[in-house]
């Protein structure tokens, strides 16, 4: 694969990560209206007269998003030409660009006309899909699947259930987390893991939003732990699956820790951004596992004379 394409794909992936973190920074610092009700300009000007921290954050996010959109478009065109023969290339290229444009339009609509918190909570999730698609394109360009013998994978039904179920459910968790930010419910519950030491259940809307997210997060932590145990028992000889789940477990635990620290530090900005970073990485890993699962589904369910069910019926040595 062309060295220049690999470098460009890596840079584009990092740029998309900056888009995600930048969006979280805008929300955390309440900088969404830093440029007023004007888009793409700031207060209708190319160079605003009154420079404020919120304006700098919002304008920087717009510039990074615009640059990332151009880079993603170039990456899509180049990858389409160079490796269009790979089945996943074209769908991933379309997903990465379309969802990046969509998140930009939602952001612009929020600035110009305003949007409800429930609609704005979709903004981060849509960006996350674009980031995951760019990341998968990059992994295909680096031929990671060949390096880890991913082309010979065989997955049993239980592992498929974990992969499909967890990535769908993780998107719900992401939405609840974004809703916490956009409804200003991050500090609605002063205690952790319960909302308050003196009572078990929330009593008002913001507390319900916060505790709903914590409950959803607890479920995904347990689910990923179960999937990791299954991978450790049956997939040690398939390192891309085994280590994929190990990394997922470490990331979701880091997500839990930073989520708790957000409460204990009363919304420390760096910890809040780390919280967004870890969920972005986790979704990227889960997306790659999904790609592998979809690939294996297209192949006959036999390997070396044994069925998938036979392979999964006994632990790998």
Swiss-Prot record:
Which residues are on the Cytoplasmic side of the membrane? Answer: 1-6, 76-91, 143-159, 236-243, 294-317
UniProt key word Repeat:
no
Active-site feature positions: 58
Q: Which cofactor does it need?
A: heme b
Q: Name one GO biological process term.
A: heme A biosynthetic process
The record's comment about this protein's domains reads:
The N-half (TM1-TM4) and C-half (TM5-TM8) domains are connected by an intracellular loop. Each domain is formed from four-helix bundles and they align in a pseudo twofold symmetry manner. The N-half domain is the substrate-heme O binding domain and the C-half domain is the cofactor heme B binding domain.
Q: How does it assemble?
A: Interacts with CtaB.
**What does the record give as the function of this protein?**
Catalyzes the conversion of heme O to heme A by two successive hydroxylations of the methyl group at C8. The first hydroxylation forms heme I, the second hydroxylation results in an unstable dihydroxymethyl group, which spontaneously dehydrates, resulting in the formyl group of heme A.
What's the protein here called? Heme A synthase
Native organism = Geobacillus thermodenitrificans (strain NG80-2)
